[in-house]
């Protein structure tokens, strides 16, 4: 049994759901049709019954702890999932350290950012999530991180370029939301969603990033890959070794086909599951 907080989750069911989730939204939103994989978009979930809600909360808590272990959420990043077939989302709370968050800490809010349940307080920046969910029906999960290397690009005029094969999914660009501070009003949430457009990630100037996916597993893996690519680019640009040459469109199409398949997403998700399990035992 895999446990998160007080709610047990069977490991086989958990991984089955993760694999199904990874199959969703595998094509980068603004990549051309020729560059996209053929896997379907959408959520693997069809019903929002109580059992599914508990499992979703457990997955949010686990993903948050894993992001904390990777050092990219800090003290106040958060993860959310849309409850399929409803106007509600589940999101991590404001008032719990990210490396100890449990199933019972996750709260429910509606798309107007009104908290509906939960013993904890919703994030001050719930509008990061609800703003994007209102604008993007294809998005089923959002990760808000505070990644060091990615945020560095939010204060320069240089864009994040695909310089790592895992960065190919961001070849259509990572825009910057040009507002400094918390995204804590409907107007700011809507503005962030407009800045994101149909892309996979957006930087919050001098602040963080919001990464979207058709499943929690996909949003999680994309968040990791955004920071990997940003680190690679900064290292290359500051090495003094010469001009940085990003991927060609042909490179992008090939790398997406090779490394953004459902099996590839699941492999990376499983790696972080195992890494988290080892860290938890240490």
Give the residues covered by each predicted segment:
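Glycine-rich flexible loops
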Residues: 16-29, 35-282
């Amino acid at each position: 049994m895999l446990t998160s907080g007080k709610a047990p989750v069977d490991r086989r069911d958990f991984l089955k759901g993760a694999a199904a989730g990874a199959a969703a939204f595998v094509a980068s939103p603004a990549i051309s049709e020729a560059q996209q994989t053929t896997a379907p978009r959408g959520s693997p979930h069809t019903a929002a019954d109580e059992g599914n809600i508990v499992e979703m909360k457990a997955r949010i808590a686990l993903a948050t702890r894993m992001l904390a272990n990777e050092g990219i959420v800090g003290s106040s990043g958060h993860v959310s999932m849309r409850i399929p077939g409803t106007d509600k989302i589940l999101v991590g709370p404001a008032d719990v350290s990210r490396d100890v968050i449990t199933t019972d800490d996750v709260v429910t809010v509606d798309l107007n950012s009104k908290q509906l349940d939960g013993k904890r307080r919703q994030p001050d920046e719930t509008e990061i999530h609800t703003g994007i969910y209102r604008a993007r029906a294809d998005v089923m999960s959002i990760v808000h991180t505070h990644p060091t290397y990615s945020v560095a690009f939010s204060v320069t005029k240089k864009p994040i370029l695909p310089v790592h094969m895992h960065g190919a999914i961001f070849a259509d660009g990572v825009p910057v939301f040009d507002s400094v501070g918390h995204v804590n009003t409907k107007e700011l949430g809507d503005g962030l969603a407009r800045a994101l457009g149909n892309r996979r990630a957006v930087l919050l100037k001098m602040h963080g990033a919001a990464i979207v996916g058709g499943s929690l597993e996909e949003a999680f893996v994309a968040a990791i890959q955004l920071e990997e690519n940003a680190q690679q680019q900064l290292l290359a640009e500051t090495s003094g070794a010469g001009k940085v040459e990003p991927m060609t469109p042909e490179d992008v199409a090939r790398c997406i086909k090779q490394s953004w398949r459902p099996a590839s997403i699941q492999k990376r998700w499983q790696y972080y599951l195992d890494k988290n399990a080892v860290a938890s035992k240490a």
